[in-house]
Amino acid sequence: LQANDAKFGIGGYKENRTLYRRSELFAGEEARSLHLGIDIWGPAGTPVYAALGGMVHSFAYNDKFGDYGATIILLHQLETVAFHTLYGHLSLADISTLHEGAYINRGQVIGHFGEPAENGNWPPHLHFQIIHNLYLKDGDYPGVCTISEAEAYLGNCPDADLILNMMKYVQ
């Protein structure tokens, strides 16, 4: 960010990233490398606002190296369609007062970019992801899949830019 005199950086949906090799969390017969959300990098402590109103479905502190750190998942209902949004790599303090079932208004501060020591050891950023079906998961859902799993995961996790509408600004 400093080299480009930028306040924020954006990482896109469906990017095939080799940087996940740094964590055993993404290892296996076939390494997970395909990104399922949008990342927004910036200074630790940057406020995170709810993109849509919704109910707190679940939250967790996913503390493994390379994981999300503090994570919040909201449940949304638009007409007859229910879906979730995941906010990852937040500050641990952000989940200390949450409770499941609480309503969050659109534009409400729901978190802050966490420091590396609490966000999975990543540079401070937000991972934002849309998820149709959580398959009974609470406070966590894969943000990266293998190439061979792409069709299933991309079908369940549409491009988060459908909500954020910000990739048009990426050069």
Name the predicted role of every residue range:
Residues 44-47, 94, 100:
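Short, conserved secondary-structure segments in the cores of folded domains
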Residues 35, 76, 89, 125-127:
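Histidine-centered active-site/metal-ligand motif
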Residues 28-65:
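Short, glycine/small-residue-enriched coil/turn segments at secondary-structure junctions
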Residues 96-108, 115-118, 122-171:
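Acidic, glycine-rich catalytic/binding loops that coordinate metals and/or anionic ligands
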Residues 40, 54, 74, 107, ...:
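Terminal peptide-recognition signature
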Residues 1-39, 43, 149-171:
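Polar/charged, compositionally biased leader and regulatory segments
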Residues 57-71, 108-125:
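Flexible, gly/ser-rich surface segments that form the specificity/activation loops bordering the active-site cleft
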Residues 50-94:
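Zn2+-dependent peptidoglycan hydrolase active-site motif and core
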